[in-house]
């Protein structure tokens, strides 16, 4: 996950070493209520008692924690042979779903939540919108696949400075693929912008290219602050909405999406041995990784 890379770079205050990273996890339960079951884990743990939890907004629980994080509560993550998690966060996998593909449930839930939240802000049917997706990583690609295959959107542009990633995504997503400075990314040219990057420069581009009355859906967490054109946001009635994680309902829906192959081919996932994890981090850091998602197998 991109957030694991933030930790790798020492830029995530919620992930402080020593810590086992990893929150996109599937496998076989070794003990307890679900012993022997093949499952996927919802890594987001909430109190289940507060106002937010009782109103199906568990991702906003003030006591939430996540495996693979050290704050607010240290919970070791899934980049290991074993991981511990409450029974309430365990979902059995249908026999028709490959256990390795099931590990994609968490980023699919993140992407689904972002698309649904963004759709609520629009003033026209989402299928008719001009949409820019910033970032050709897993979240950007999955958002694009949901928009294209589930929401029937036809006017999608994906931007990323990594040409290798763009080329790989072009094999699976029906969209235009451009670098961020491409002329096709026009001022006021998009009804919705999905920022899966979260840099100051991506936010500046998002507000520049979003059309009057349009929406910016902010997912990325790379840089927490920076300059932003709030004047345009105000006088052009732009909706800027942050989106974090997903609800339990979103997570359950991802099981339906994955089981029924609604994202199409998942050959863009690369599988590697867990022992080769350090090499994967280095490749991503150096911009040499083609795959939008690498899954490590213990």
What are these regions (language model features)?
Residues 97-180:
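Mid-domain Rossmann-like dinucleotide-binding core that forms the NAD(H)/NADP(H) cofactor-binding site
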Residues 40, 194, 217:
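N-terminal Rossmann-like NAD(P) cofactor-binding module of classical short-chain dehydrogenase/reductase
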Residues 11-54, 94-96:
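Glycine-rich beta-strand-centered segment in the early N-terminal region that forms part
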Residues 200-260, 297-298:
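Glycine-rich phosphate-binding loop and adjacent beta-alpha segment
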Residues 184-193:
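A short acidic, Gly/Pro-enriched loop at the edge of an enzyme's catalytic core
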Residues 176-182, 271-276:
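Short acidic-hydrophobic, aromatic-tinged amphipathic segments that line or gate anion-handling sites
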Residues 204, 248, 252-298:
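C-terminal hydrophobic helical "lid"/dimerization subdomain
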Residues 49-134:
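NAD(P)H dinucleotide-binding glycine-rich loop of Rossmann-like/cofactor-binding domains
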